């Protein structure tokens, strides 16, 4: 892809993000890539058939119009599914330290298992989603941003049948490329390493397809019984779970497994409270377990990932070397996720080998230019707003959610609602729901009230600006 095409693609993504909103964009378009640009057509790709079908059904016109705003001559946008790698299982006896350590959910392609062990019969019989043998605990890079998630996942994986279940469900959420899938597949591999427990890994897409297929073939009862007979259910990308009937079945399965003392592990790109498409009962059950956020990769962790990626590449390219100053430069400038870090090393490897040149800082600056993105605004959560406002006005968060009408509570509540409307993409009904189940008209009144006061009251205006700065830091 040329720099011109990359710039166009960045602008199109910006238009699309503005058009559909941050939440819809992160759910459906964050993993869409540009493959090629022709004079009158554009070729895009996504990783799954489900994403392709959903985007084509609901957003094809929107995507085309965003491209036509950039290139009026474009009349067609083609969307295809990127070829997925279906890997065999890892060697049971492979030592953990022999695997290069990664954190981005997609480790070095050069790594290969030295021996092949079969995937568990349960996983295959129930049509489990494909597992990558490189996504194990041994290849996971641990840093401050993921320590708790790793420790919780490890404890779940090391449990035995009949042990008390401590974290149920274990719910891990983070942005794209921060290691959620890596941890979930690591739990699956570790759980399947013996014959004692039945562990099943499914993407939300796979769960939907499996349930719909069972309904069509009139085998829904067998599908339900099989799922509820396993010991550990691992569900990835829960934000893609769609359809009332499917969600109801997922809720029943979740309740049945948890009530029976079986383990459930789930990953999504947002906390349970932000999964607005899910039924309130499901969100409540998910929030009742251990909810862990994997934060953005710190610079030290990014440097560790880069070093491990270089080590992995040397297994097949012994002369490949990246000087430490170059790695430090990459760690400082590529800040979004581990997949961009992997892409940077792949580019340096290709350039070095194809041109028979050593890797230099100048080469790195040139080759990764399009991976250095402007810093995106911090995503602010309503819970953060409530916490910061409560602290500022010396009230509790429960006061903000309560029905109390005393002056020392009403004003902070109105300020918090105003900030929720101005700093997030949440709708008025959603904001009202998050403030103790209030009506959207109550939120609208609060927003207009604070807007009017801020225009006249300098002290309140300064307070609101201070709160905004605290939330955006």
From Swiss-Prot:
The keyword Lipid metabolism does not apply. Gene3D superfamilies: 1.10.1750.10, 1.10.8.60, 3.30.300.180, P-loop containing nucleotide triphosphate hydrolases. Its main location: cytoplasm. ATP binds at residues 177, 179-181. It is found in: Cytoplasm. One of its GO terms (cellular component) is cytoplasm. Disulfide bonds: none annotated. PROSITE patterns: DNAA. Residues 353-473 are annotated as: Domain IV, binds dsDNA. InterPro entries: AAA+_ATPase, Chromosome_initiator_DnaA, Chromosome_initiator_DnaA-like, Chromosome_initiator_DnaA_CS, DnaA_C, DnaA_dom, DnaA_N_dom, DnaA_N_sf. Residues 73-129 are annotated as: Domain II. Keywords: ATP-binding, Cytoplasm, DNA replication, DNA-binding, Lipid-binding, Nucleotide-binding. The keyword Magnesium does not apply. One of its GO terms (biological process) is regulation of DNA replication. Signal peptide: none annotated. GO terms for molecular function: ATP binding; ATP hydrolysis activity; DNA replication origin binding; lipid binding. Pfam families: Bac_DnaA, Bac_DnaA_C, DnaA_N. Residues 130-352 are annotated as: Domain III, AAA+ region. Residues 1-73 are annotated as: Domain I, interacts with DnaA modulators. HAMAP family: DnaA_bact. Plays an essential role in the initiation and regulation of chromosomal replication. ATP-DnaA binds to the origin of replication (oriC) to initiate formation of the DNA replication initiation complex once per cell cycle. Binds the DnaA box (a 9 base pair repeat at the origin) and separates the double-stranded (ds)DNA. Forms a right-handed helical filament on oriC DNA; dsDNA binds to the exterior of the filament while single-stranded (ss)DNA is stabiized in the filament's interior. Oligomerizes as a right-handed, spiral filament on DNA at oriC. Domain I is involved in oligomerization and binding regulators, domain II is flexibile and of varying length in different bacteria, domain III forms the AAA+ region, while domain IV binds dsDNA. Belongs to the DnaA family. This is Chromosomal replication initiator protein DnaA. It comes from Rhodopseudomonas palustris (strain BisB18). The gene is dnaA.
């Amino acid at each position: 892809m040329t720099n011109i095409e990359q710039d166009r693609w960045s602008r199109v993504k910006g238009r699309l993000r503005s058009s559909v909103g941050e939440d819809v964009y992160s759910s459906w378009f964050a993993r869409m890539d540009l493959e090629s640009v022709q004079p009158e057509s554009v070729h895009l790709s996504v990783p799954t058939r489900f994403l392709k079908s959903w985007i084509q059904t609901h957003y094809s016109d929107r995507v085309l119009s965003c491209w036509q705003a950039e290139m009026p001559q474009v009349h067609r946008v083609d969307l295809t599914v990127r070829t997925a790698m279906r890997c065999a299982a890892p060697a049971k006896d492979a030592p953990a330290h022999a695997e290069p350590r990664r954190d981005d959910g997609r480790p070095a392609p050069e790594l290969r298992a030295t021996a092949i062990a079969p995937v568990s019969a349960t996983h295959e019989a129930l049509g489990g989603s494909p597992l990558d043998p490189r996504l194990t605990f041994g290849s996971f890079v641990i840093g401050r941003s993921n320590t708790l998630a790793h420790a919780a996942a490890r404890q779940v994986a090391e449990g035995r049948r009949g042990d008390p279940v401590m974290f149920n469900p274990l719910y891990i959420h983070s942005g794209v490329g921060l290691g959620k899938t890596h941890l979930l597949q690591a739990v699956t591999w570790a759980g399947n390493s013996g014959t004692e427990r039945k562990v099943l890994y499914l993407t939300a897409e796979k769960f939907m397809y499996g349930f719909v297929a069972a309904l069509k073939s009139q085998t829904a009862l067998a599908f339900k019984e099989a799922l509820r007979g396993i010991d550990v259910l691992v569900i990835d990308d829960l934000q893609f779970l769609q359809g009332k009937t499917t969600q109801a079945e997922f809720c029943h399965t979740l309740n049945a497994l948890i009530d029976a003392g079986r383990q459930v592990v789930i990953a999504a790109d947002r906390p349970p409270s932000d999964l607005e498409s899910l039924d309130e009962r499901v969100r409540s059950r998910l929030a009742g377990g251990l909810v862990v956020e994997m934060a953005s990769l710190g610079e030290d962790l990014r440097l560790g990932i880069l070093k491990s990626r270089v080590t992995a590449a040397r297994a097949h390219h012994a002369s490949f070397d990246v000087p430490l100053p170059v790695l430090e430069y990459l760690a400082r400038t590529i800040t979004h996720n581990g997949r961009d870090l992997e892409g940077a090393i792949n580019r340096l490897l290709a350039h070095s080998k194809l041109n028979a040149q050593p890797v230099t800082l100048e080469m790195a600056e040139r080759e990764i230019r399009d991976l250095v993105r402007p810093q995106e605004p911090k995503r602010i959560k309503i819970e953060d707003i409530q916490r910061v406002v409560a602290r500022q006005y010396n009230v509790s968060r429960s006061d903000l959610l309560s029905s109390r009408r005393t002056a020392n509570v009403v004003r902070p509540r109105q300020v918090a609602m105003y900030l929720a409307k101005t700093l997030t993409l949440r709708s008025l009904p959603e904001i009202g729901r998050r403030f103790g189940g209030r009506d959207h008209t109550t939120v609208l009144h609060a927003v207009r009230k604070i807007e009017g006061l801020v225009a006249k009251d300098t002290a309140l205006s300064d307070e609101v600006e201070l709160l905004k700065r605290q939330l955006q830091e």
